[in-house]
């Protein structure tokens, strides 16, 4: 005799008769409560654009950071639970630094994503906290430039990650994704990608778009001291954002 749905909910590793993990599905729904983020791969590099949602006028706006630096050549943005994202971002940063200290070269974007996916697959599980573990309620976009060129990976709460040309996560991801499908092409420049990302955010955000409630990072290819191809993580200034937003 089958258990009720609520009983299948109790264990993160218990499949329902239909082959579903309800706790993972709930974690994916939590992602849809987060603010919208967009990643776009272009012919000149890759960029991340994220909505910074302030819940109070008393909050210090600069304290909200939706795009984190993993390493010189990799950035990551997220949608979902902030506390969960911090755990995963910290894992990515540690993995990147350990790789640098061990091999004296920069880690690939895919390898960083894989290491975080491995943690997500465990649902934060270990022997001590096994009874309290749950899936991470966060989706992430890893963007960077390595020896293989510009890369953009989408990671969801199930631990699945996919190589993308463009991707949106968060509350308005469905509308943003449709716009990306209609407007994206492989010959995009960074400037065109930036304008596209901000135009889409302007369309899907509930608040009026301005440089205070959006954050953009660009990662362009360069070379390191030994002449090896690598990326350079750069935050787009408020002045540049205002110029592009005004032109929309």
From Swiss-Prot:
Q: Can you state the subunit structure given in the record?
A: The 26S proteasome consists of a 20S proteasome core and two 19S regulatory subunits. The 20S proteasome core is composed of 28 subunits that are arranged in four stacked rings, resulting in a barrel-shaped structure. The two end rings are each formed by seven alpha subunits, and the two central rings are each formed by seven beta subunits. The catalytic chamber with the active sites is on the inside of the barrel.
Q: Which SUPFAM superfamilies match?
A: N-terminal nucleophile aminohydrolases (Ntn hydrolases)
- Tell me the protein family, please: Belongs to the peptidase T1A family.
Q: Mind telling me which Gene3D superfamilies this protein's record contains?
A: Glutamine Phosphoribosylpyrophosphate, subunit 1, domain 1 (3.60.20.10)
Q: Quick one: a GO cellular component term? A: nucleus
Known function: The proteasome is a multicatalytic proteinase complex which is characterized by its ability to cleave peptides with Arg, Phe, Tyr, Leu, and Glu adjacent to the leaving group at neutral or slightly basic pH. The proteasome has an ATP-dependent proteolytic activity.
Q: What is this protein called?
A: Proteasome subunit alpha type-5
List the Pfam families: Proteasome, Proteasome_A_N
Keyword field contains ATP-binding: no
Cited InterPro entries: Ntn_hydrolases_N (IPR029055), Proteasome_alpha (IPR050115), Proteasome_alpha-type (IPR023332), Proteasome_alpha_type_5 (IPR033812), Proteasome_asu_N (IPR000426), Proteasome_sua/b (IPR001353)
Q: Chief localization class?
A: cytoplasm
Q: Which SMART domains match?
A: Proteasome_A_N (SM00948)
Biological process GO annotation list? proteasome-mediated ubiquitin-dependent protein catabolic process
Keyword annotations for this protein? Cytoplasm, Nucleus, Proteasome
Q: Where in the cell is it found?
A: Cytoplasm; Nucleus
Keyword Cytoplasm belongs to the record? yes
Q: Which domain of life is it from?
A: Eukaryota
């Amino acid at each position: 005799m089958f258990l009720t749905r609520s009983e299948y909910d109790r264990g993160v590793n218990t499949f329902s008769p239909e082959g579903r993990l309800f706790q993972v599905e709930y974690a994916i729904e939590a992602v849809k409560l987060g603010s919208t983020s967009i990643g776009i791969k272009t012919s000149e590099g890759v960029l991340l654009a994220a909505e910074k949602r302030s819940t109070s006028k008393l909050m210090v706006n600069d304290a909200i950071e939706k795009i984190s630096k993993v390493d010189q050549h990799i950035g990551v943005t997220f949608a979902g639970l902030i506390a969960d994202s911090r755990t995963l971002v910290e894992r990515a940063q540690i993995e990147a630094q350990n790789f640098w200290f061990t091999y004296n070269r920069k880690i690939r974007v895919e390898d960083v994503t894989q290491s975080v996916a491995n943690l997500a697959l465990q649902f934060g599980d270990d022997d001590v906290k096994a009874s309290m573990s749950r899936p991470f309620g966060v989706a992430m976009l890893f963007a960077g430039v390595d020896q293989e060129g510009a890369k953009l990976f989408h990671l969801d709460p199930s631990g699945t990650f996919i190589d993308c040309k463009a991707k949106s996560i968060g509350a308005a991801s469905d509308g943003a994704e449709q716009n990306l499908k209609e407007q994206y092409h492989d010959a995009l420049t960074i400037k065109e990608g930036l304008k596209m990302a901000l135009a889409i955010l302007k369309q899907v955000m509930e608040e009026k778009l301005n440089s205070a409630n959006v954050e953009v990072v660009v990662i362009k290819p360069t070379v390191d001291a030994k002449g090896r191809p690598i990326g350079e993580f750069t935050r787009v200034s408020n002045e540049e954002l205002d110029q592009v937003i005004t032109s929309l």
